[in-house]
Amino acid sequence: NWSWCSGSGEGCDYHSECCGERCCIESMCIGDGVACWP
């Protein structure tokens, strides 16, 4: 569950985490910016 973001975290809302080029939406960033889980 993700959407695009910038490296600064811009574009992620309060319950999202910037993970590389994507926002992890209600999930966590794993693999040093590789993927969102779950």
Curated annotation (Swiss-Prot):
Keyword Disulfide bond among UniProt keywords: yes
Entry GO CC: extracellular region
Coiled coil: none
Top-rank lineage group of the source organism: Eukaryota
Cystine connections: 5-19, 12-24, 18-29, 23-36
Keywords, ordered alphabetically: Disulfide bond, Ion channel impairing toxin, Neurotoxin, Secreted, Toxin, Voltage-gated sodium channel impairing toxin
One function term, GO molecular function aspect: toxin activity
Keyword Chaperone: no
PROSITE patterns: I_CONOTOXIN
Subcellular localization(s) per the UniProt record: Secreted
Main location: secreted
Tissue and organ distribution: Expressed by the venom duct.
Family named by the database record: Belongs to the conotoxin I1 superfamily.
Domain notes for this protein: The cysteine framework is XI (C-C-CC-CC-C-C).
Function summary: Iota-conotoxins bind to voltage-gated sodium channels (Nav) and act as agonists by shifting the voltage-dependence of activation to more hyperpolarized levels. Produces general excitatory symptoms.
Name by which UniProt lists this protein: Iota-conotoxin-like L11.5
Species per Swiss-Prot/TrEMBL record: Conus lynceus (Lynceus cone)
